[in-house]
């Protein structure tokens, strides 16, 4: 601690003499560990101080800490100073109140050496004794202050050494933590690379499985298309044979009845057949378009729902496969339509040729016999025509029903194959998705 932390203060006390003597200044100079303030006034209610000079020696045992720490110590210092006053002067000042004005003074060389200038009173020998005692007490207090300063410096040195040790330990701890963090980062990178490698292996396996499934699906579609084409060809042949037999029977039964009405009936039948075929073709086209639209919408919805779960590579593969299958189905349907149209045109040409041949033969044979029986046979021919029209309508309805049933079977097969394909893809995607969070954890 520096000397500036303590201030030296002087106070002049005046005492009234009972014999009319001049007022004398007290040689006692109080000293205490006060900060530099303008002035300190003792309260008027402080008790009167009457002390014996014999007790002055016992006050030197006061500790320096008690004097420095609290305002009570300042009062003790004032009491120490007041003990040095001669008893005669203290008795004269019992009824007076102390008004001590303290002024900060600069420290001089004498203060650094532990001495303070005191006001001497040559007339009173007791004042000299009290000054000597004060100097002794001040020297003891200065010694104690020096000791406390040395202790403070020693404590500061201990604190600095402890702080240095703390910094060293903190640096070592931080280095250990950094090394642990680096090891954890290396381990994390290794695990991440392992996880990426496993994901790549799973993706490769998934692509291979998808390629195998696509090949199987293509083979199944080709076999189903071949079977359908063969079945349709057989049905067409059987229907043509049935129609040929029926036409032959009708021609044999009506070769004597038909002459002039055959042309009109033929035209009517042709128109009706054309209308029926047009209606049938339109209905089939509408049904096929509706079915294709429904299948497209279902396929789109299924692909959209599956695409949300799949990754980009799987999405591209599935979409390409679906588009190829759509194109193949459309091509197959177009080929079937073309085949049906060509076969139907051939059948119509054959039927018309046979009808024309039979008509020409019958005309030559029945020109003479038919003219007389035309009126009688008109009613019968009308009834027969109506029955034939009804039969043809029934046969066309049955044929349309069979075609619808076959189309439904084809659609069900294609939808079942698509469902199998999508279920396999979903299972593979779910397996991939289930393995990813486990690897991440």
Curated annotation (Swiss-Prot):
GO cellular component, one term: trans-Golgi network
Record's bilayer topology term: Peripheral membrane protein
Any GO MF annotation of the entry: identical protein binding
Keyword Plastid: no
Modified residues (Phosphoserine): 43, 46
UniProt-annotated stretches for the region Homodimerization: 210-413
Gene Ontology terms: biological process: Golgi to lysosome transport; protein transport
Quaternary structure (record): Homodimer. Interacts with GGA1, GGA2 and AP1G1.
Protein name as it appears in the record: Coiled-coil domain-containing protein 91
The organism's taxonomic lineage, starting at the top: Eukaryota, Metazoa, Chordata, Craniata, Vertebrata
Gene (name only): CCDC91
